[in-house]
Every structure is written in C-alpha cells, then in structure tokens.
C-alpha cells in the first residue's frame, strides 16, 4: 500500500512538470486565444478565454485566474523570439483600496517554433501600476470583465 501511494505521489509530481509545446501558429489559430494588446514593444498579449475563472469572491476581494500568452513578435530586435505561457491570478481588495495585484503562478517559455526552453513557478505577488496603463493592467482589466462582467475601473467605483 505504501508503495502504491508513493508511486501515485511521484506521478502527481512528475506529470505536471512535462511541458507541452506550443507554437505561435497554434496560439493564433486557437479561437479561445484573444489578442488583448498588440504592437507595443513588439509584444502581443493573448488571453485564453476558456481558461478565465473566478477563484474567489467575497465581501473583501475579487480574484480571477487565466492563462496568458506573452508573444514577442518576429519584428522585434531580438534574434530569438520567444513565447511566455503564464498562469496568472489577479486580485482586487475591496476594503483596502490597494488597487490591482498580480501573482504569476507558473511560466513556461518556448521559442517561436514551440520548442520548450524552461519552466518557472510561484513568482510573488506584485502591484500592477494602474496609472501607467501597463500591459498587465490591460490584460487584468479584460480578465476581470470576462470573469465578473465588469472592468477593474467599475469595481473600484462601486466599492463601499
């Protein structure tokens, strides 16, 4: 019984570590991937619409999660264009009025053809600069709208 349990535990650890290749063509052709921000710094941000979900909502916070692709376009100055596949969690504290926060739960890196370059996880929570309208803010606004039916700006207007 112990041996079976340890084999199951090992399988649970090893299987998620395998990275499934994804190319730029696959991202563009998938109807669930919505381009949110294009052209700035030769980077396009796609959100996998099918991955958007509410994580937590109560009297204190809104939390939503989604898979985001950050794709460096071929016209960038780099010789090796890349793709980041990122699982992100956006959080808004209603009571604290601390703005939008972002936690990166996992990152998988690929070259343009879809060959895996590496994987990372659990990047700490960071504040998103709402005033600058940075890409993380625009992406987060879209994710909140899809998850809750309202954008981040409207959430902040209606807080108590």
Describe the residue ranges of each PLM region:
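Intrinsically disordered, low-complexity segments enriched in polar/charged small residues
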Residues: 7-8, 150
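N-terminal secretory-pathway/extracellular module detecting exported/lumenal segments
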Residues: 21-85, 94-160
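Residue-level detector of buried hydrophobic side-chain packing
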Residues: 88-90
């Amino acid at each position: 019984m112990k041996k079976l349990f340890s084999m199951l535990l090992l399988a649970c650890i090893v299987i998620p570590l395998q990275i499934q290749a994804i190319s730029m063509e696959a991202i563009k052709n998938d109807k669930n991937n919505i381009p949110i921000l294009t052209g700035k710094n030769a980077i396009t941000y796609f959100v996998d619409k099918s991955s958007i979900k509410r994580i937590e909502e109560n009297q204190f916070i809104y939390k939503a999660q989604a898979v985001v692709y950050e794709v460096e376009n071929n016209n960038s100055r780099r010789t090796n264009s890349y793709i980041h596949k990122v699982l992100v969690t956006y959080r808004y504290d209603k009571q604290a009025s601390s703005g939008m926060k972002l936690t990166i739960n996992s990152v998988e890196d690929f070259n343009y053809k879809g060959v895996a370059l590496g994987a990372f996880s659990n990047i700490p929570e960071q504040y998103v600069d709402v005033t600058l309208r940075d890409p993380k803010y625009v992406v987060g606004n879209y994710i909140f709208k899809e998850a809750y039916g309202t954008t981040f700006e409207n959430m902040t207007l209606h807080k108590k």
